[in-house]
Amino acid sequence: MDQGKLYGVGVGPGDPELVTRKAERILRGADVVAVPDKGAGEKTALHIVREFVEGKELLCCPTPMVRDRSLLDGCYERIAEDICALLDQGRSVAFITLGDPTVYSTYIYVHRKVLARGYEAELIPGVPSFCAVAARLNTSLCEGAERLLIVPA
């Protein structure tokens, strides 16, 4: 049996209309959708894409909003183990994440762990919030020779 593939899918800043066509295609085709849960049942990313994943098997991925690196690493390790077990069954897994998976995303830690174990994984970009805000304000983030610097809050 062939191994499945993991997709880290950016679902944008919150508006379902900003989910890319590629993200929608990957989500509709995935066997399992991995859903980050920050606690208290908060699954914002799932609410954004619910129309694309209706009836899909969901894998709840506890990702508490804490600064304890050892606790977080343990969570990411367990999530990676669960995902790899699904990949070993030949199933495809789409891990949804707000914005873009390469910009301050919880997903990237799981991505690295899965890749380190020899599995195939692909990043599916999404609209990052800072781009959505600029569009909402009808303004440019930078032009010509200007530089753009993104600094965490």
Which residue ranges define each predicted feature?
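Class I SAM-dependent methyltransferase SAM-binding "motif I" and its flanking Rossmann-like core
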Residues: T102-A153
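Class I S-adenosyl-L-methionine
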Residues: M1-P16, R21-E24, R28-E120
